[in-house]
């Protein structure tokens, strides 16, 4: 088994791998080198941190510690020496490995705009990616009244929602004609824009930015249509780029990300890569679920727990859920082609649903607003299970035909065999017979049949039948 | 309930009592039918060595046969070669006497009981969090006043109907009822909000609820700081359970998780209750712990009107787990590996502490070792029917057949008794005095209406008879009294100073006060309806958080076994059905086993309502008619566990057990379903 594993990166992927290794049997030394000086944290919660409702300790994750895990935050790796099987750290230390894992993640893209130098951004211009970014945003936001978010993708909207929750007048500037165009169709994008507007976020669509001017007092964002927007803070959310610098310098095969096979191995069999920095089968991950799946597979392979484990990408679900926003997008909902399409739109209430079904399986869905079946839809898509025979269940949830038969409006319409009291298995017929044999009050019928003496939930129904019997002249009952 | 006996027999009358308030379900109303049931055993049965059949025998012959065999087995294979299996339906006195009999008369470490199958995970979770395991640490009446009540894996509308009166009162008072259950049960139908997770994902749901409570600022930070320890580790572990992650795993929409967390986090009086649905998993202790963590983070336990509790299952589910029929336990909820506990109990029993055996193994492990080279060769069963109730039941049936001696004490010829070498007819509920302890920790009286029929003996008398044959008759008579009041007096002394302290309880006090809540250390001091007001039962008085994470079920679905299988109860039957299947009205109400499945699934499998279906797992199969219901998830099928033979659900269930409690994973395994 691998004796010394070095993980470069203590982010969502690297920290998870350390935990997965920790949970498996075997004797090994695992060193985690994190460039950031923090404990492992949950990047997904950073937008909530922006709202001010939680504090930094609330985003910390469980760290594997002890039992052969050496966790070293704040130690950047500067080089990999593949022939010596060593990594070099920022302060010149050399650390040997039997197996090296690159979990270096991705960096925020700073768009090539006049006024933005990626190596020296103005104080009021901050990308939204790391905990340190978050601290900088919060430092500026404290006392600020307005913010612009450049980029209307998932992260940009989360940042905008977080800043708006803090009370900042927030504007999202997006270069294409609708929000989250990679996940949504134009109609859904429009409904989402309406929802965000209701939450106090202004949306500027189809306007590329052309330049940034920032000083100590504020930021000006110039737009292609000639307008300029002013704010106290500019947050950049223009995508991320895999951090492949170490891999490239070490001569590993790198395309957009560090190229890995199904075992997460790079072109060097002693080096693996997982998470945002890795490119598997031509695809980058960019989300937590695949990164954690990769960590699990790699831990299985490295520890020999399951040497045959292989990473198989699963379709991803994009989820945006915050106060007032409920969005799920998965697969190809708008692609057309063979199959069925289900749609529902109630733009006034911010609800939109579009689902595509092929061969009884969901191949894509966009759900926005109040969609009670959202959990079912996500699970059916994720697991590839067949869809309900009655498709409406996908739109309306279990409200449809779900919970048992509703009580009949009139006792006259109830079949005699209908069980009124479940606890004591008393049928309508039994109640009628009891009444006919002389019981004329609710208490007498209860005493005679035991109906209503268990959970008591049917007392009203029994009372209704007694009332009906008192009023009806002649009631037929089958034996 | 109150009983009346006249020329026509015994009849049952409901009684206004603080817990059921006059409510009885059909099983209560019809319970007297068993007293004079024609199937009632009234003579011991001995297996004829030639014909292999059970034949009536005298008590002396039966007891001599047992004693001779036990002595021979213990002298050749050691004391632990004899095992004892008890039940959560036994009175406190009988459970106590059974534990003492095992440790003192047999001196075997091998004793456990069927409560391991139904309450042990909540017990373990409660102990490690609070230092005390009492089902409800507050009176049941608190449920009726809760603003928010969360029921996790509990279906009282079918398993405990009179309790539903409290739920009705709660909702009439404007309270919100939230139910977590993979099926739309009779209880879920009454809920304001029903979360319907995939079986085996309740732990993730709890962690997501706590995640939301943290991000929304609903955690009671002052309470966490003053009354608990270990929260930081939990906070970090639930940080990884953002709601969308739990949604994808469980199928519970984030919006529903948020609504639930809000109701729990912002309600005034908030109660969280778990039951078998949360417990009967290979991660049952951790699942219950996740809900305990949630309750602690919200500051519920110990706050009047709020709290966490476990709905206990069997008739004496609480008392049965307190006085020594558990493998690792001595009376008073003491640990058998605690030297001080051993000294105290050995003193009461009049034996040297060193003579007491050490801890045995949990129920399933015990049953699974029977008749194996290193396992017990003899088993005495009191008040249990593992042939129907154990997981992977066909295997356990085989183990029982491998024994050199199987003795079953029962009032009816249960499926387990039918395999026995010796069957001893015992008295039943209306024929014995004693006490039971209900889910509130309230000790109650059971009063004998009439003596047992001729030929029938009480469990206490059987233990005394056996002890006399196994050792010195005079000592045995002193150690194993047959009068329940005498046994209770000794139980009081044995429990004194323990967690479940009964020292101050006597039968008259129980009668006067409608039951007495333990701990009650002194006859002139108060009892304890509410626990944890000032401190928890841990050494430092603080409740303990434990970080717990979701893990997959022991057996997940695959291409060959693509469906989840889960088990449970129906209203008109009880446990292994030995008693309720013999009551005509109950048989009419619930005549046979069934397999509940969703109409979409049924359509894909070509199954119509009522068709015979076969459910197959890696361990066995179940055959029963299909019952179509849109109240179950299409990826899950359900069967009740009350029946034997082809309809035995436990032929299919998984025998994976929780690493801490030893509770089997009855609630989830992988199956395939086809038309039979």
Sequence positions of predicted segments:
Chain A
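A Rossmann-like FAD-binding core segment of flavoenzymes
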Residues: 27-31, 71-89, 95, 165-260, ...
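Mid-to-C-terminal Rossmann-like scaffold of FAD/NAD(P)H-dependent oxidoreductases
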Residues: 2-4, 277-375, 402-425, 429-430, ...
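Local cysteine-cluster metal-coordination motifs and their immediate loop/turn environment
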Residues: 417-431, 447-466
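FAD-binding core/adjacent interface of flavoenzyme oxidoreductases
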Residues: 1-2, 6, 62-148, 222-224, ...
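FAD-site-proximal beta/loop scaffold in flavoenzymes
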Residues: 120-144, 214-222, 227-293, 297, ...
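A short, polar/charged loop-to-alpha-helix boundary motif
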Residues: 371-389
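Glycine-rich Rossmann-fold phosphate-binding loop(s) that bind the pyrophosphate
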Residues: 9-12, 129, 150-153
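Beta1-alpha1 glycine-rich phosphate/pyrophosphate-binding loop at the start
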Residues: 1-70, 160-183
């Amino acid at each position: 088994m691998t004796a010394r594993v070095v993980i470069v990166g203590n982010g969502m992927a690297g920290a998870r791998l350390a935990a997965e290794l920790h949970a498996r049997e075997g004797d090994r030394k695992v060193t985690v080198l994190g460039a950031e000086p923090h404990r492992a944290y949950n990047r997904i919660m950073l937008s909530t941190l922006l709202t001010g409702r939680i504090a930094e300790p609330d985003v910390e994750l469980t760290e594997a510690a002890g039992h052969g895990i050496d966790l070293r935050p704040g130690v950047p790796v500067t080089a990999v020496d593949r022939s010596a099987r060593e990594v070099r750290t920022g302060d010149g230390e050399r650390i040997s490995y039997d197996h090296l894992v690159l979990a270096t993640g991705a960096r925020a893209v700073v768009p090539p705009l006049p006024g933005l130098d990626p190596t020296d951004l103005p104080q009021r211009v901050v990308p939204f990616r790391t905990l340190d970014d978050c601290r900088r945003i919060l430092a500026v936001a404290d006392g600020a009244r307005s913010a612009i978010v450049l980029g209307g993708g998932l992260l940009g909207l989360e940042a905008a929602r977080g800043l708006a929750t803090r009370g900042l007048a927030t504007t999202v500037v997006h270069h294409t004609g609708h929000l989250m165009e990679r996940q949504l169709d134009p109609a859904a994008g429009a409904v989402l824009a309406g929802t965000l507007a209701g939450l106090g976020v202004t949306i500027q669509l189809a306007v590329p930015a052309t330049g940034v001017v920032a000083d100590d007092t504020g930021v000006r964002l110039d737009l292609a249509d000639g307008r300029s927007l002013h704010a106290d803070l500019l947050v950049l959310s223009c995508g991320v780029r895999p951090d492949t610098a170490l891999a490239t310098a070490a001569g590993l095969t790198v395309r957009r990300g560090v190229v890995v096979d199904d075992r997460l191995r790079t072109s060097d069999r002693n080096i693996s890569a997982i998470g945002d920095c890795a490119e598997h089968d031509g695809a980058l991950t960019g989300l937590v679920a695949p990164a954690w799946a990769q960590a699990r597979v790699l831990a299985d392979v490295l520890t020999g727990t399951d040497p045959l484990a292989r990473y198989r990408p699963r379709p991803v679900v994009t989820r945006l859920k915050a106060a007032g926003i409920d969005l799920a997008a998965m697969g190809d909902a708008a692609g057309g082609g063979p199959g069925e399409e289900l749609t529902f739109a109630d733009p006034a209430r911010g609800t939109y649903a579009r689902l595509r079904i092929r061969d009884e399986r969901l191949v894509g869905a966009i759900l926005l607003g109040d969609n009670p079946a959202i959990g079912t839809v996500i699970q059916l898509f994720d697991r590839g299970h067949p869809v309900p025979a009655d498709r409406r269940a996908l739109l309306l949830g279990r409200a449809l035909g779900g919970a048992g038969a509703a009580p009949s409006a009139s006792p006259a319409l109830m079949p005699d065999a209908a069980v009124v009291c479940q606890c004591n298995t008393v049928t309508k017929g039994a109640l009628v017979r009891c009444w006919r044999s002389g019981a004329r009050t609710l208490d007498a019928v209860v005493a005679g049949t035991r109906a209503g003496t268990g959970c008591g939930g049917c007392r009203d129904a029994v009372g209704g039948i007694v009332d009906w019997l008192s009023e009806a002249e002649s009631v037929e009952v089958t034996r | 309930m109150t009983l009346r006996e006249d020329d026509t027999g015994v009849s049952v009358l409901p009684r206004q009592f603080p817990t059921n308030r006059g409510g009885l379900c059909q099983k209560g109303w019809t319970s007297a039918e068993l007293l004079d049931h024609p199937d009632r055993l009234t003579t011991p049965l001995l297996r004829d060595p030639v014909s292999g059949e059970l034949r009536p025998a005298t008590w002396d012959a039966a007891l001599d046969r047992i004693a001779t065999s036990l002595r021979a087995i213990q002298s050749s294979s050691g004391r632990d070669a004899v095992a004892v299996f008890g039940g959560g339906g036994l009175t406190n006195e009988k459970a106590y006497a059974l534990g003492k009999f095992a440790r003192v008369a047999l001196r075997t470490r091998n004793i456990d009981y069927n409560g391991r199958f139904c309450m042990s995970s909540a017990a373990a979770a409660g102990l490690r969090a609070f230092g005390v395991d009492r089902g409800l640490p507050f009176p049941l009446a608190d449920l009726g006043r809760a603003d928010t009540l969360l029921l996790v894996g509990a279906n009282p509308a079918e398993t405990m109907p009179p309790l539903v009166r409290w739920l009705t009162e709660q909702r009439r008072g404007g309270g919100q009822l939230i139910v977590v259950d993979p099926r739309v049960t009779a209880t879920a139908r009454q809920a304001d909000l029903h979360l319907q997770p995939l079986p085996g994902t309740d732990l993730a749901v709890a962690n997501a609820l706590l995640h939301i409570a943290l991000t929304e600022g609903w955690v009671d930070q002052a309470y966490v700081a003053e009354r608990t320890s270990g929260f930081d580790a939990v906070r970090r572990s639930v940080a990884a359970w953002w709601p969308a992650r739990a949604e994808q795993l469980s199928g519970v929409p984030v919006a529903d998780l948020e609504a639930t967390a809000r109701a729990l986090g912002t309600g005034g009086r908030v109660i969280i209750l778990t039951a078998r649905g949360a417990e009967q998993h290979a991660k049952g202790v951790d699942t219950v712990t996740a809900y305990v963590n949630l309750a602690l983070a919200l500051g519920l336990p110990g706050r009047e009107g709020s709290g966490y509790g476990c709905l206990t299952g069997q008739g004496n589910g609480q008392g049965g787990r307190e006085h020594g029929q558990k493998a690792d336990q001595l009376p008073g909820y003491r640990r058998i590996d605690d030297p001080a506990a051993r000294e105290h109990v050995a003193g009461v029993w009049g034996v040297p502490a060193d003579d007491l055996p050490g801890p045995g193994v949990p129920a399933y492990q015990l049953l699974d070792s029977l008749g194996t080279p290193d396992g017990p060769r003899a088993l005495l069963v009191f008040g249990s029917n593992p042939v129907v109730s154990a997981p992977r039941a066909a295997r356990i049936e085989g183990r029982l057949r491998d024994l050199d001696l199987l003795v079953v004490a029962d009032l009816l010829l249960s499926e387990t008794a039918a395999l026995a070498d010796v069957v001893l007819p015992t008295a039943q509920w209306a024929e014995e005095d004693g006490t039971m302890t209900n889910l509130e920790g309230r000790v109650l009286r059971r009063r004998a209406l009439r003596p047992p029929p001729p030929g029938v003996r009480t469990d206490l008398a059987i233990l005394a008879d056996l002890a006399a044959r196994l050792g010195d008759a005079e000592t045995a008579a002193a150690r194993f009294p047959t009068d329940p009041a005498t046994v209770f007096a000794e139980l009081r002394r044995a429990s004194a100073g323990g967690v479940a302290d009964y020292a101050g309880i006597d039968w008259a006090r129980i009668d006067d006060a409608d039951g007495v809540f333990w701990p009650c250390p002194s006859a002139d001091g108060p009892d304890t309806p509410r626990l944890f007001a000032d401190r928890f039962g841990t050494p430092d008085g603080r409740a303990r958080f434990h970080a717990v994470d979701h893990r997959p079920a022991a057996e997940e679905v695959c291409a060959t076994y693509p469906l989840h299988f889960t088990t449970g109860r129906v209203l008109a039957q009880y446990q292994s059905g030995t008693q309720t299947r013999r009551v005509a009205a109950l048989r009419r109400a619930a005549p046979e086993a069934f397999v509940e499945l969703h109409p979409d699934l049924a359509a894909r499998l070509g199954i119509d309502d009522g068709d015979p279906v076969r459910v197959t797992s890696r361990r066995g199969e179940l055959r029963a008619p299909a019952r179509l219901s849109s109240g179950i998830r299409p990826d899950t099928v359900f069967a009740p566990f009350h029946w034997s033979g082809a309809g035995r659900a436990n032929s299919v269930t998984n025998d994976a057990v929780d690493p801490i409690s030893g509770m089997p994973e009855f609630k989830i395994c992988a199956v395939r379903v086809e038309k039979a």
